[in-house]
């Protein structure tokens, strides 16, 4: 059974998020980490190799063009916490305008992406995937730039992985996370705003702020 949108949003508003043990487990549980992963929006680490890859182009980035495709891409791995109940819950949130995706395309194929939940000026990153080298890094670079440009104050990554840490994410105590969350919830942001996001523009803005 999927979680009703109002229950999901309330959970995020108090600093917890749902997970499942694996795709075939119908049970969903709430998680409240002692230490929380966050992505400082002015601290993205853009490596020279990633900047070169972005300058070469050959890819396109879109917003909310294929939310279900991103969700399924994130679930398409040997071990995943995205079970049918969670999938249905986030699709419902997306239809209500509270969950968004950023897609990376190449030659008409979805090669990477990230999705998350929005409340106020907080973006709760849920999962990402990559079907080509650097596709998830490109997605994150464009996502961080979009969050900065559209008024966000908090990018919650839930947990800190080595991959995220290499790109600039950090870990903070639960109490500090909740302080940042409260401030962000009182703010306003527009994830889907029309903005400039050319690869060169993203590189320039990230380089100026990191």
UniProtKB/Swiss-Prot annotation:
Statement: the UniProt record of this protein carries the keyword Transferase: yes
Pfam families: Leu_Phe_trans (PF03588)
KW Aminoacyl-tRNA synthetase (keyword) present: no
Reactions that this protein is recorded to catalyse: N-terminal L-lysyl-[protein] + L-leucyl-tRNA(Leu) = N-terminal L-leucyl-L-lysyl-[protein] + tRNA(Leu) + H(+); N-terminal L-arginyl-[protein] + L-leucyl-tRNA(Leu) = N-terminal L-leucyl-L-arginyl-[protein] + tRNA(Leu) + H(+); L-phenylalanyl-tRNA(Phe) + an N-terminal L-alpha-aminoacyl-[protein] = an N-terminal L-phenylalanyl-L-alpha-aminoacyl-[protein] + tRNA(Phe)
GO cellular component: cytoplasm
Top-level taxonomic group: Bacteria
Similarity comment text for this entry: Belongs to the L/F-transferase family.
Name of the protein: Leucyl/phenylalanyl-tRNA--protein transferase
Originating organism: Ruegeria pomeroyi (strain ATCC 700808 / DSM 15171 / DSS-3) (Silicibacter pomeroyi)
Gene expressing this chain: aat
